[in-house]
Amino acid sequence: VWLDPIASPREVGQRMVVAKVRFAPGARTAWHSHALGQTLHITQGVAWVQSRGGAKVEAYPGQTLYCPPGEEHWHGASADSFMEHLAMLDTADHPPATTWLEHVTDEEYLS
């Protein structure tokens, strides 16, 4: 997984963070949540996104997905395709903007 920051807060009161994130085939994040939510805009390849307890969603370039505040989820590339997305979120103080949890198992990833 490669992360390239695009935008971050520069002035008092600004909270938006934007990054380009690239995934090799089969690569994915760990389970995590965001205090103020997260928006993902797919730019290349095939993305897999899943909220805990929900069905895995497949997304393609041009599609935008939203993960609500506090929703545990993971995202990554499909098993046979590179994937790139823009990740956008507002930073938060308490709790932190991103709370990282356990790794996504191969069984969870492939289900």
Identify the meaning behind each predicted range.
Residues 1, 8, 13-14, 74-111:
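Double-stranded beta-helix
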Residues 1-30, 37:
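A short glycine-rich, His/Asp/Glu-containing loop-to-beta-strand
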Residues 20-24, 33-49, 88-91:
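Short, conserved beta-strand element in jelly-roll/cupin
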Residues 32-34, 73-75:
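Histidine-centered divalent metal-coordination motifs
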Residues 53-70:
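Short acidic-glycine-tyrosine-enriched beta hairpin
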